[in-house]
C-alpha cells in the first residue's frame, strides 16, 4: 500500500508540474510585461555605472541620452544609489544569461524591445527573467519603511536596472 501511495503521490506531482508548465508556456508574455520605467528614465536616474552599450548608442533615439551621464568605463558614482549591484558579465555568460541577439544583456534587449523589435523566443525568455525579479521589489516593500531610500540600496539599484521603480 505504501508503494502505491508513494507512486500515486509522485504521479500527481508530475502531473501538476506538467499542468503548471503548460500554463506558463501558454501565458501571453506581452500582457504580463509591465515595466515601471523606460530606458530613458532608467539612464537619467543612473544605472550600469553610466557605461551603456560600450558607448555605441547610435541605434537608440538621441532623446534617450539627454540628461544622462555617460562613462567609457563603469563608474559607481553614476549609479543612482552609488553602489555596485549585479554580477559580472563573465558570470552572466557562465549562467547562460547572454544571448547572441543581445550580447550586452537584458538592458540591451529592453531598449531594443522599446524601440519596437520583437523576437518572440527572446522576448519570452527576457520577460520571464524580468518577472522573476519582482521578488526583490517585494523584499524591499517587506523590509523597508516606505521612502527610506537608504534601506537595501543594492536591491534598489538592482530593481532600477530591471525597470522597476526603486522609490518604494
Region spans (language model):
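Compositionally biased, intrinsically disordered low-complexity regions enriched for acidic
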Residues: 14-101, 105, 117, 135-158
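Short linear, low-complexity motifs centered on an aromatic residue
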Residues: 113-137
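Charge-patterned, phosphorylation-rich low-complexity C-terminal interaction regions
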Residues: 160-168
Amino acid at each position: 500500500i505504501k508503494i502505491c501511495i508513494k507512486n500515486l503521490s509522485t504521479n500527481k506531482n508530475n502531473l501538476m508540474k506538467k499542468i503548471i508548465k503548460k500554463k506558463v508556456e501558454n501565458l501571453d508574455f506581452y500582457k504580463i510585461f509591465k515595466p515601471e520605467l523606460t530606458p530613458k528614465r532608467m539612464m537619467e536616474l543612473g544605472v550600469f555605472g553610466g557605461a551603456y552599450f560600450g558607448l555605441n548608442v547610435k541605434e537608440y533615439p538621441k532623446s534617450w541620452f539627454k540628461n544622462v551621464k555617460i562613462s567609457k568605463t563603469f563608474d559607481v558614482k553614476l549609479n543612482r544609489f552609488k553602489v555596485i549591484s549585479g554580477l559580472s558579465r563573465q558570470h552572466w555568460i557562465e549562467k547562460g544569461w547572454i544571448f547572441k541577439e543581445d550580447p550586452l544583456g537584458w538592458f540591451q534587449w529592453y531598449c531594443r524591445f522599446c524601440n519596437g523589435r520583437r523576437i518572440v523566443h527572446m522576448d519570452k525568455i527576457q520577460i520571464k527573467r524580468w518577472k522573476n525579479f519582482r521578488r526583490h521589489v517585494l523584499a524591499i516593500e517587506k523590509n523597508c519603511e516606505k521612502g527610506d531610500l537608504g534601506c537595501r540600496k543594492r536591491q534598489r539599484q538592482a530593481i532600477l536596472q530591471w525597470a522597476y521603480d526603486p522609490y518604494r
